[in-house]
Regions:
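Low-complexity, Pro/Ser/Thr
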Residues: 21-42
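Exposed acidic/Ser/Thr-rich ligand/metal-binding surfaces
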Residues: 21-27, 118-338, 392-397, 412, ...
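A broad, low-specificity signal for short, low-complexity segments enriched in glycine/proline
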Residues: 31-35, 96-102, 153, 215-217, ...
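An acidic, Ser/Thr-enriched
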Residues: 35-75, 79-97, 111-122, 129-136, ...
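C-terminal motif of bacterial Sec signal peptides marking the signal peptidase cleavage site
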Residues: 16-19
Length: 502
């Protein structure tokens, strides 16, 4: 990780305290401390040991050679929260941790409420970092549900209590998050608690939330210690979920760990296959990561993807409030195996590049294959994707679409897919806040990755695009990103400017 000077670290740390309150709103007060305090005196670099999978940015593709692009949706937001944790402390995250699609999908966009399970929309506008290119924004939204419409829940909390979890930004924060989630559930919802370290323990059998005191007492009793050798931890969690399966309900494992994924299945392929088998039986898996230094990001993402789930990185109280309170409906899938396919018109588009989604690209023939796994969309959740496109030299005033946007999804696992289709036209001279904000977030991600495709993107461009897109910001997360950028240290600003100049 890139070293930042002592004074820069202190300034950034002060911003961390002011921008993210660590005093819990949960009445139980399980978490008492500030994340930054766990690092003590300024250090040469953030804790080492985090593991990421390197990848190469998607390239431009000639429409004459391949006019069709297919990818699975990705509703995770872990990459953005991980970046925020590093940048707010004066450091840069590993570029392999920066996944632009997760930056985009951390935020909710102002998309129309769909009549059915999913709605789609799109627009085309100018590309801020290349005046000769256009940007195509794709949007999807899962149908919102009210509190009364939430499905009955059967949750299994699978908690890592190994010694590595014994720091303020790990187990205490996780306990506070789970206590907060319990307060949000309905009296007839069910919660189980399984822990693992040197051994596996079913600390709490499935219990209705009307007995919240019993559930909370079990959560408060959690303490960290011992090695991480999980035995049959994840298998036990799945068996617990199946034993209390609610037909037509939200059956889900919520796993909290610092990322050392030793849960009893040591072979990666065996683990992924097991998770897939249980996913096919209707058990979803939500991964929640905490802390740094032991972080196996690549495994966490793969497992959550195969488990029909979500992947979050929780670095502060505001983040667990986002995940378990403000966006709790996102834990209820309304669309399964959701795929997008874009077919470009070669008379209007010469080349295109999908920004992000590198590990979610699919073969074109997989789009119509209902046996192929893809991502889920939660209730009220929005998904955003961007293509940078190179227009042809001959542009026509004829009403010819730039592309056709097809989306396939299943309302329930095991059912046949439904398909939505939208022809994409565009007025290049106009844009919307949705497009400007998406462009700003993508440009920031490309700067952090020092992408060869960043063009003229720079920090001031990013701040201008985001700052002009704040009218729709119901929970203040867009403003939070702008505040982060405005409080970067001089060293961080200089580094971003150096990357922009290359």
């Amino acid at each position: 990780m890139k070293k930042i000077t002592f004074m820069a670290f202190v300034a950034a740390l002060a911003f961390t305290f002011s921008s993210c309150s660590f005093a819990p709103k949960a009445p139980d007060g399980a978490f008492d401390g500030a994340i930054g305090e766990s690092y003590g005196e300024p250090i040469e670099g953030m804790p080492s040991g985090d593991q990421f999978e390197e990848f190469t940015d998607n390239p431009f593709i000639s429409t004459s050679e391949e006019p069709t692009s297919t990818f699975s949706v990705d509703a995770d937001g872990a990459s953005y929260a991980y970046m925020r944790s590093y940048m707010s402390k004066g450091y840069f995250p590993d570029k392999s941790s920066v996944r632009v699609e997760e930056f985009l999908n951390y935020f909710t966009f102002d998309y129309p409420e769909p009549e059915n399970a999913v709605g789609i929309n799109a627009e085309i506008g100018a590309c801020p970092w290349n005046s000769e290119h256009y940007l195509l924004r794709l949007g999807l939204k899962g149908k919102s549900v009210s509190e009364e419409e939430m499905l009955p829940a059967n949750y299994v909390f699978l908690v890592d209590v190994s010694g590595s979890m014994n720091s303020e930004d790990k187990l205490p924060l996780l306990k506070s998050a789970l206590l907060t989630l319990v307060d949000e559930l309905q009296p007839t919802d069910r919660v189980s608690l399984i822990t693992y370290s040197g051994s596996v323990q079913r600390l709490l059998e499935s219990t209705q939330v009307m007995h919240a005191g019993k559930i909370k007492s079990a959560i408060r009793s959690l303490g960290a210690g011992g090695s991480t050798a999980g035995g049959a931890a994840i298998k036990m969690a799945y068996e617990e979920a199946l034993a209390n399966y609610i037909i037509g309900g939200n059956n889900r494992i919520i796993m909290g760990t610092d990322g050392d994924f030793n849960v009893g299945v040591t072979n990666t392929d065996s683990l992924l296959n097991m998770v897939s088998r249980y996913a096919d039986q209707g058990i979803y898996l939500t991964m929640c990561g905490f802390g740094t230094g032991n972080w196996n990001d690549a495994m966490m993402e793969k497992v959550s993807n195969r488990g029909n789930g979500n992947y979050y990185y929780i670095d502060c109280e505001d983040e667990f409030m986002k995940v378990f309170v403000h966006n709790r409906s996102h834990l209820q899938a309304v669309a399964n195996d959701t795929k997008c396919q874009i077919t470009f018109d070669s008379t209007r588009v010469a080349q295109y590049r999908l920004i992000g989604y590198e590990n979610r690209v699919m073969n074109n023939e997989d789009f119509d294959d209902d046996t192929k796994d893809a991502g889920e969309i939660g209730a009220g959740q929005t998904i955003t994707a961007l293509y940078e496109i190179v227009p042809t030299m001959l542009q026509s005033d004829e009403p010819i679409p730039y592309a056709t946007f097809d989306c396939r999804y299943k309302e329930q696992l095991g059912l046949s897919s439904k398909q939505l289709t939208l022809d994409i036209y565009g007025d290049i001279k106009s844009d919307t806040e949705n497009l400007r904000f998406a462009a700003g977030v993508a440009a920031y991600g490309m700067l952090l990755r020092n992408s060869e495709y960043k063009g003229t993107a720079n920090l001031e461009m990013v701040k201008q695009l985001i700052g002009s897109s704040l009218n729709y910001d119901p929970k203040g997360y867009r403003q939070g990103l702008l505040d982060l950028l405005n409080h970067l240290s001089s060293d961080q600003v200089n580094e971003l400017n150096n990357r922009a100049a290359k």
